[in-house]
Amino acid sequence: MSDILEKIGAYKLDEIAAAKRARPLASVEEMARAAGSVRGFASALRARVDTGAYALIAEIKKASPSKGLIRADFDPPALARAYQAGGATCLSILTDGPSFQGAPDYLSDARAAVSLPVLRKDFMYDTYQVAEARAMGADAILIIMAAVSDAQAREIEEAAFGWKMDVLVEVHDEEELARAVELKSPLLGINNRNLKTFETTLATTERLAPLVPSGRLLVGESGIFAPDDLTRLSKVGVRTFLVGESLMRQTDVEAATRALLAPPA
């Protein structure tokens, strides 16, 4: 595990312990049951791809450990509406505070502003966080294989399925991919960013995509900035993309989203 993930993991475990003391699991589960119906995340992506179009998971992200502040003018509901109007299929919303300046309210407020399914983008180590995610209104959660053991991954996935949520399983190399395909989720994200060095290359997806068993919905993550990047990754079977930073830096997020998804002339 990389230094950054070790650092994040350490404070996350402290956060989880503090959250459990402040709000017992039974209380969080009660909130989760009252959160309303789940919007189908994976089904929305599949339906979009089945039309022959690209499916975009558009990310609402204020900052990151590697880039610092990404967007000062940060209004999650307005950004969610812009993404929806621009053609996004789903949203990904950062809820991690220390590293990404995210917050649970960002997810709840953004989801309330649109009809799109929403992923809680955070570092998941405990099934308590899954109930938390549903209580926030999340429709899907992320499992980063570099951050968890196989047993943790299975427990978190089963907890998500128990809440009828979808799971995006993220990998960066062959070893993580081999572990990920043992899980049940059809959503498999290939992160082009190396979490050890933070270097980013689309060649990661090009290398790993051919190794993925059929039936999985591949998601290209990180390093995607232009329509040419989508075209490049589509050549190895990727038609669903998670894009955040490049869109967050634009003045007109709706127009930038539409331009990214525009079919080649």
Swiss-Prot record:
Catalyzed reactions per annotation: 1-(2-carboxyphenylamino)-1-deoxy-D-ribulose 5-phosphate + H(+) = (1S,2R)-1-C-(indol-3-yl)glycerol 3-phosphate + CO2 + H2O
E.C. number: 4.1.1.48
GO terms of molecular function: indole-3-glycerol-phosphate synthase activity; phosphoribosylanthranilate isomerase activity
Protein name: Indole-3-glycerol phosphate synthase
Lineage: Bacteria, Pseudomonadati, Pseudomonadota, Alphaproteobacteria, Hyphomicrobiales
Keyword GTP-binding: no
Pathway annotation from the record: Amino-acid biosynthesis; L-tryptophan biosynthesis; L-tryptophan from chorismate: step 4/5
Source organism of this protein record: Parvibaculum lavamentivorans (strain DS-1 / DSM 13023 / NCIMB 13966)
GO BP term (any one): L-tryptophan biosynthetic process
Lineage: superkingdom: Bacteria
Family label: Belongs to the TrpC family.
Record keywords: Amino-acid biosynthesis, Aromatic amino acid biosynthesis, Decarboxylase, Lyase, Tryptophan biosynthesis
